[in-house]
Amino acid sequence: MGFRGAWNKRNRLIEDLDTFLKLYKKAQKAYKKVRKVEFSNNDELIENAKKRYQEIWDEFRAFVNKKAWVDPKLWATIRKMNQTGDRKVVKTYSRDSQVISDFVNHTIAVHNGKTFVPIYITPEMVGHKLGEFAPTRTFRSHPEKSAKVVKKK
């Protein structure tokens, strides 16, 4: 029952970041409560905590499923940078976050499993996932045929 980001099918933008963050924090608190209560012997407490968490989680999923998924911390950072006019490189592990219009003209360093790959966001990238621009595998040319390799008929 861990927290996972929802995948969006409609590619819409979340306009209300404050509501999103409130629901996100509410879901996290409810999940922590479930984890805390699981060690008690009171089955009624456990069931109530799980039921409450499920209600909050369903509300969060209903809100997120209609919108594009963006990591809340990444979005909050970019939002602050837009307000102050900063243009620093932002590091993120969130490859599944979608590029939204707020990210345009920013450089986001996306982790590819080994290093952070800096990506300058352009308007053409809006709607794509950040992970699409940070390849996880390096392509080295195909091996050349050597004289030792002989085809058998």
Swiss-Prot record:
PROSITE patterns found in the cross-reference section: RIBOSOMAL_S19
The organism's place on the tree of life at top rank: Bacteria
GO molecular function terms listed in the Swiss-Prot or TrEMBL record: rRNA binding; structural constituent of ribosome
UniProt cross-references to Gene3D superfamilies, sorted A to Z: 30s Ribosomal Protein S19, Chain A
Start and end residues of each stretch annotated as Small ribosomal subunit protein uS19: 64-153
Region forming the signal peptide: none
Pfam families, A to Z: Ribosomal_S19
GO biological process: ribosomal small subunit assembly; translation
Cross-referenced SUPFAM superfamilies: Ribosomal protein S19
HAMAP family found in the cross-reference section: Ribosomal_uS19
Alphabetical list of NCBIfam families matching this protein: rpsS_bact
Protein name: Small ribosomal subunit protein uS19
Gene: rpsS
